[in-house]
Structure formats: structure tokens, C-alpha cells
């Protein structure tokens, strides 16, 4: 079995949808959110940027949000709490606590070895490789649902996971497939 101890994954982006359970007057919200834009003819929500935590929020009159750019779930929770405090300051009433739903997590990583992507693409099921269009193999994992981009350097990008555990499971499945088809050798133990 391939050892994943040498594989490193780092969160690059988390996208979450949020329901605040409150109706929002976007003109009033615009007044309390510096670093924001609102042009209803172009987009029906406010685009707001926070510096701490460093995230972008799409704020809609329905009280629904999209938070993106976060590097941790804690950053999303902090951003939502920060917005709620600002909204309370203009008299917004909330029916209940916010509901945060992680939609997508993107990780970058390194498997720690190089790959011949032509061999990978010809052998591995559930993958696509068109080097004229993109320099990596696109490997699709069904359960947990995720997409892994594998580059010849051994670097990877995993997207579509809803949790870090799902990302790790997707990477383990890729490594097992690479090993199963002889595209990666087990490291020999030193005597």
C-alpha cells in the first residue's frame, strides 16, 4: 500500500453558502460594508471583501450569502459572525442562527514523485488528458465526489471535496489506483 505520510495537502480556497435567516435591505448593507460594490443592473447582490479574515462575500437580499477565498472553516465562521455583528448594528433581526454549508474545498499538494502523464492517461480509468489544452491529468473520484489534477511533477490540485477528510480519501483512492496499475511503485524499505 502506498504511504500517504509524504503527501502534503494545503487548503487553497473554501466556498460556502450561508443562510442568515433574515431579509436584507442591500442599500443599508452597502453603508456598513466598506470595500464593497453593488450594481443591481449587473448583479443582484453586494460583492464585499473583508481583510480579516481575507474573504469575499456575495450578499443577497434574501439573507443568503456565498463566502469564498477562505483558507479555513474558522475563517468562514469569523466572516459570517463579523457580518452578523454589522447587520445587528443596522437593526437586522435573525430568525435563528446562521446555517453554513461547505460547497467546495480546493487543496494543493505534492505526491513527492514524478509521473509520465501519457502512461497515466492510457492506463488509469476515470481520467482525461489533453496536453495541448491542459498540462495535467484530470482524475475524477466518484465517492467522495472530487476531481484531482495530477501534474508530471507529482503536484496535485484536489477540488470538489466538501471536507478535508474527503480530499484525503480522494487522494488515497488516486494513489491506490496508480499503484494498482503499476504507475507508482511502493518505496522499498532500506535494510
UniProtKB/Swiss-Prot annotation:
SUPFAM superfamilies membership: TATA-box binding protein-like (SSF55945)
Classification via InterPro entries: TBP, TBP_archaea, TBP_CS, TBP_dom_sf
GO biological-process terms attached to the record: DNA-templated transcription initiation
Disulfide bond positions: none
PROSITE patterns tied to this protein: TFIID
One Pfam short name: TBP
Sequence repeats: from-to residues: 11-87, 102-178
Gene Ontology MF term list: DNA binding; DNA-binding transcription factor activity
Keywords noted in UniProt: DNA-binding, Repeat, Transcription, Transcription regulation
Family membership noted in the UniProt record: Belongs to the TBP family.
Role played: General factor that plays a role in the activation of archaeal genes transcribed by RNA polymerase. Binds specifically to the TATA box promoter element which lies close to the position of transcription initiation.
Protein name: TATA-box-binding protein
Amino acid at each position: 500500500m502506498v504511504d500517504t505520510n509524504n503527501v502534503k495537502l494545503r487548503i487553497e480556497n473554501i466556498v460556502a453558502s450561508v443562510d442568515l435567516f433574515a431579509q436584507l435591505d442591500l442599500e443599508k448593507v452597502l453603508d456598513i460594508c466598506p470595500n464593497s460594490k453593488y450594481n443591481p443592473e449587473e448583479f443582484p447582490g453586494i460583492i464585499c471583501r473583508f481583510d480579516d479574515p481575507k474573504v469575499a462575500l456575495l450578499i443577497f437580499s434574501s439573507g443568503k450569502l456565498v463566502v469564498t477565498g477562505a483558507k479555513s472553516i474558522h475563517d468562514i465562521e469569523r466572516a459570517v459572525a463579523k457580518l452578523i455583528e454589522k447587520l445587528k448594528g443596522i437593526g437586522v433581526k435573525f430568525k435563528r442562527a446562521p446555517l453554513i454549508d461547505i460547497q467546495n474545498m480546493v487543496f494543493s499538494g505534492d505526491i513527492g514523485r514524478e509521473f509520465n502523464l501519457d502512461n497515466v492517461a492510457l492506463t488509469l480509468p476515470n481520467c482525461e488528458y489533453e496536453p495541448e489544452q491542459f498540462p495535467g491529468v484530470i482524475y475524477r473520484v466518484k465517492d467522495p465526489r472530487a476531481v484531482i489534477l495530477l501534474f508530471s511533477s507529482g503536484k496535485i490540485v484536489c477540488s470538489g471535496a466538501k471536507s478535508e477528510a474527503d480530499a484525503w480519501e480522494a487522494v488515497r483512492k488516486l494513489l491506490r489506483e496508480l499503484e494498482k496499475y503499476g504507475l507508482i511503485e511502493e518505496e522499498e524499505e532500506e535494510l
